[in-house]
Amino acid sequence: DSRGTQLHRALRKATILSVSARCKLSGYRCKRPKQCCNLSCGNYMCG
């Protein structure tokens, strides 16, 4: 239903904001290298 979709959309927006606001330290989950402080993302983990 639309309520679930809105919630999901808001959640995704918040996640994107948190990722762009500050980088992830080594050991955190990542999808792209630029999400990590050292720009290293291997095996879905910051290196």
Swiss-Prot record:
Disulfide-bonded cysteines:
C23-C37, C30-C41, C36-C46
Chain residues in the propeptide: 1-22
Subcellular localization(s) per the UniProt record: Secreted
State a single Gene Ontology molecular function. toxin activity
Q: Cite the entry's keywords alphabetically.
A: Amidation, Disulfide bond, Ion channel impairing toxin, Knottin, Neurotoxin, Secreted, Toxin
Tell me which residues bear Cysteine amide. Answer: C46
What domain of life does the UniProt record list for this protein's source?
Eukaryota
Q: In which tissues is it expressed?
A: Expressed by the venom duct.
Gene Ontology CC entries for this record: extracellular region
The Swiss-Prot or TrEMBL record describes its family as follows: Belongs to the conotoxin O1 superfamily.
Q: What's the entry's take on its domains?
A: The presence of a 'disulfide through disulfide knot' structurally defines this protein as a knottin.
Tell me what this protein is called.
Answer: Conotoxin Bu10
According to its UniProt entry, this protein's organism is Conus bullatus (Bubble cone)
